[in-house]
Amino acid sequence: TPEQQRYVELFIVVDHGMFMKXXXXXXXXXXXIHQMVNIMKEAYRYLYIDILLTGVEIWSNKDLINVQPAAPQTLDSFGEWRXXXXXXXKSHDNAQLLTSTDFDGPTIGLAYVGSMCDPKRSTAVIQDHSEIDLLVAVTMDHELGHNLGIRHDTGSCSCGGYPCVMSPVISHDISKYFSDCSYIQCWDFIMKENPQCILNKR
């Protein structure tokens, strides 16, 4: 049944700029990440997906990839790094890079679509675009949604009168609900592609 629970083991990397922004305190950065992942759990409950934080790596000395304003290049480099280097890191299904770099144009996050469990492409890059953890967490929800095969909502999609997570435009109202379309697209992807890595929780 589609309702069979799925588990996304999430690995988060905090880049050097974001580490410095958080007053170079690793504890502060880690606490913020835990908060954001708890917010993500709420949204994903509706999709019958549990988000498990399996690791946080903080690039406290220097960035291990070239983090640049061109989001597609940064996403590509991060994917290469994950496939090559992070194998050493704990087993995980999906990795997100949080950066203080201001991406070109209105972009605040970028992810491959329908790439969950792919060694290189099960990744996303997220700009730490707000002082409000909640707003950044919604962007994390949104990009992970793309990895799970969810596209942007169109006019006919709804999530009960609230702003929806997969809306193409960022809303300053907090969107913590996935739309009916998102639900269908996510489970279409899971049933068709059957990404194996999200069946277990370790």
UniProtKB/Swiss-Prot annotation:
Binding, Zn(2+): 142, 146, 152
Tissue spec. comment: Expressed by the venom gland.
Chain positions recorded as Ca(2+) binding sites: 9, 93, 197, 200
GO molecular function, one term: metal ion binding
InterPro entries in UniProt: MetalloPept_cat_dom_sf (IPR024079), Peptidase_M12B (IPR001590), Reprolysin_adamalysin (IPR034027)
Cofactor note: Binds 1 zinc ion per subunit.
Biological process annotations from GO: proteolysis; venom-mediated fibrinogenolysis in another organism; venom-mediated fibrinolysis; venom-mediated suppression of platelet aggregation
SUPFAM superfamilies, sorted: Metalloproteases ('zincins'), catalytic domain
Disulfide cross-links: 117-197, 157-181, 159-164
Statement: the UniProt record of this protein carries the keyword Disulfide bond: yes
Family annotation (PROSITE patterns): ADAM_MEPRO
Compartments, as annotated in UniProt: Secreted
Family: Belongs to the venom metalloproteinase (M12B) family. P-I subfamily.
Subunit organization: Monomer.
Annotated protein name in UniProt: Zinc metalloproteinase barnettlysin-1
